[in-house]
Amino acid sequence: MAQQLTNMDGTFLYTDTRNTPETIGNFGIYDPSTARDGFVRFKDILRTFETRIDVVPAASRKIMRVPMDLDHPYWVEDTGFDLEYHVRHIALPKPGDWRQLCILIARLHSHPLDLDRPLWQSYVIEGLDGIDGVPKGCFAHYIKYHHAAFDGMAANDFLMALHDGSPVFPEGEFGSDRKKRRTADKPGVPEMVARSYTNFLKQQLNMAKIGAGALPQLAKERKFRKKHGLEKTPSKPDTRFNTPVSPNRVYAALEFPFSKVKEIRAAVPGVTINDLAVTIVSRALRKYLHTKKELPEESLIALTPVSLRKQEDAGGGGNSVSGLIVPIHTNIEDPLETLKAVNNTMTKSKAQRLEVGDSMLVKLVDTIPSLVQSGFGKLMDISPRIGMPAGPANTVISNVPGPRAHMYLAGAKAVKFHGIGILQHGIGLFNVVSSYLDNVTISFLACREQMPDPDVYEAAIREAFDEIYEATLKGEITPKVKTVTKAKSKKKK
């Protein structure tokens, strides 16, 4: 029997709309001088995909929906799989600089994927000679994945399957030994409908089990919070990022040297790279909203995804993820105190999850029938018009560590790697923390109507890092934003 989407996978499928395409992504810049003859043909990249694609089963599967969404769809092999549809070749418009590349990536990322095909697509992008700091002749590779098929770690597994730790050159010509896709293991309609009834009963039994454990679970949470002095996460204040999103996106990415990150961690014992990244985003949001005269008195709230994926799950696709909803202390004036507060909050929140387990809300997601999820997805699509409340967080901060050694695509050496998130109505800013070689990267995707000036937020991120670095080394600093004025949160309409 074909594998079925999980409830979490289905959530991302049902909420995919023109304004909220549920796609995450990566892009890298590559130096072809290490490839055979110092040049990479597009067909070399196609050949690389062709010889590696079977390592990632999710890359050649598509969804088969159950009539009327009575149950979650099934994954079936795409017998008409067309690699040249999924891997495309384009050129960056002149002047071919970093700004143009970010604009192009934002536009490509804003387009929904075709849900009738395997849920990913990539672009090889030439014409990057106007980008400072990279060798001439470089090309970029951008790839996006639907979150129903790949979470952040599964997407990273796909990306790594295409790469090597040394220059490896594709052998043979693209299409020379093209495999015939195996016959799709398609379930019949009667079988799917029958299973939908069985699955519904299982979900109701699971819901009853979770309900029976609700009071003990809540008691454990209260006991843990009281023991560790951890306050209940407050409601988020409303900001410009917590309104309906348009289909338009802006994107940018910044790099920071690992050497400076290590100095900060050495100066503040116990601080993790994730703590530092959350603090940088906190400080940057504080600065950005202050310039708009919209900085709330209350701390902003962030959703930080937590991967539950095990080593044996590599290449399997799908979603195995939970999340923490935490204050990021944007109401603290001093950057060093912000870092310490973030470290304290993240440490206790992670400890609570390990000791108490996932929240009731996370557990209940697995009990919601597909018909209800599908209806909720349609409701989310019209939510901007009917004034539905936004989600529980102001922004998302996702940490997906990357390789510390050189990686090669079709023999070309990667010189940069960056991640790209997704937006939802009510959460119009997504920050991704990643790493490659000797750099830590913070990239962000935002709704263009909510952030018409991404260069201002980009500058705020860089200034935030510099302030934290200076503060941790000197132990003191005079922040440029000294006070928080009366809260000017965005009003709900």
Question: Which residues make up each language-model segment?
Answer:
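Soluble acyl-CoA-dependent acyltransferase catalytic core bearing the H(X)4D motif
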Residues: 1-8, 27-38, 46-427, 431-462, ...
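Generic start-of-chain signal for non-secretory N-termini
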Residues: 1-23
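Active-site regions of oxyanion-processing enzymes, predominantly non-cytosolic
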Residues: 42
